[in-house]
Amino acid sequence: TVLDKSGKYATVYMNHDRPAQVIYQAVACNHQHQVEWDEYAAFTNTIERKHFLEHSIAQPKLTRASLIKQFLKPPLYSQQYLRGFGTLYTAAYDVAKGRVQIIWPEKQVEASFTRFEEQEVQVVLLKPVGRYLAK
């Protein structure tokens, strides 16, 4: 999903066995037009996450900061890493300022589109608790 400075958005669906398709919707998750693999959709909560996003952005008092916070907790934030699925980071683009924030629950970094400087960042995705990993 992309957004320009005027606020216009589009989502591009790409797949190996069909042509790319531009859809004018503001959100995207782990499925395209419809679910094609029920087990994967259930595992990733793709339908729930899409509905959550659509409901969130329809709220008239939604702020940028509150939307970003929603990406850092379920259902949008997932920690099923040991099962092969999870949120690695959230990217919050500010196209008017030409900046991006890369965000984790306990850390964030910023970068400029025009004066990009490479950064090295270490994050802990799952914290060990005794012999086990916390969820």
What are these language model-derived features?
Residues T1-K135:
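C-terminal, well-structured catalytic/ligand-binding subdomain of enzymes
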